[in-house]
Amino acid sequence: DGKEIWQFKTEESFTISNSKFSLIIINDMVIFSNSIGDITAINIKTGLITWQLPTQSSSIINETYNFKISKLVSDGNSIIFSNNKNEFHSIDAKNGTINWINEINSNITPIITGNLIFTVSNEGYLIVIEKNKGNIIRVTDLFKYYKLKERKKIKPVGSAIGNTNLYLTNTDGKMIVVDLNLGVVKRVEKVSGDFISRPFIVNDNIFVI
């Protein structure tokens, strides 16, 4: 009937944040991030906190304009996310304890496939990570075809995986297609003259906005 069941107020920052909120549902928990890097799990029926994990020090409250965090993704057991403070996290979905942290500078949404995690750093490196231990398996420079001056201006927007390819869109309107088996760039396509969205794959078709 549209009646409010419960509400939960999150921490407010003192500045306007560039960080986007993210929310996922795992079993009986609503799990979300906020602008200062806290990850909170709420009981979906009662609205009470199940657990909360602050990922940043208290000083981040005054620096939230520059803080960016990726969307949360999960395999049902672990929650994966990263930020532009050189931190890539895996935490236990049941209790919020940290499984591992790796030094990766990225605020785009990571992708979980089987026992692997794929992400692209803000500097344009495709990084393949072993999901359980956080070991980096492979690193591929996707921006190596750009001149240094151009490279400094370009940031990844988002990625998607279809079959054995990864598709990465960038702020320059180009899409990079990567062969995941070989770890090499297959081609670079100009999609737009300017900023485009992350790619979406539906029924073997790729969509960007």
Identify the role of each PLM range:
Residues 32-33, 82, 120, 169, ...:
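Residue-level marker for isolated small/hydroxyl-bearing positions within beta-strands
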Residues 3-27, 48-76, 97-114, 138-161, ...:
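Extracytoplasmic beta-rich repeat domains
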Residues 117-127:
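Acidic (E/D-rich), amphipathic helical modules within compact regulatory domains
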Residues 81-99, 106-109:
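Beta-propeller domains
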